[in-house]
Amino acid sequence: ALAAVLGLGPKVHPGGSSMGGHISLSWAAAHPEEVASLWLLDSGGIWSGPTSELAATIQRTGVNMLVASNEEEFHRLFQFAMSKPPPMTDGMLDVLAQDRIRNHDLELRIFAQVRGDHLEDRIRGLRVPALIVWGREDRAIHVGTADVLHALLPDSRVVVLDGIGHLPMIEAPGRVVADYLALRDGLH
């Protein structure tokens, strides 16, 4: 009933990237009657996929390349997350860096919490139309995880984008939006 309480209508179209995908999947598992479709971009929460570079690095060194406590770590994160980072001014990068640095401790706590969430058990067989988008060059969550997620969601379709990393909506926004609009158009 959350969608109705928020005035969003009887059914919504949640979507998200990485951790946002994990959150969208969690909501869909808890409230499938409220979900018209899912849009999942390099979604987190699927732990049985192939080991990613990020997972191997965390296991080997304890360093999570997706969090930043200073500007140097943010620039490393920015390069790690994307295969084709868009051009940005120094001012834009500074704003993004300060936001991530400010949230460093919170992000570490959230990563620890979601790591213990066994989402796969809750979404197996979920009958919701879903578009699964993945960057083939994703170093944070292995592209093979898209196939695992697809097997869990029988009404899903997978789009893998060559030359794209963990953030396809930033690296290839035109293609990502076109695929999403096609999903929505196909629901009517």
Regions found by a protein language model. Name each.
Residues 126, 132-134, 138:
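Short beta-strand/loop motif that positions the catalytic acidic residue
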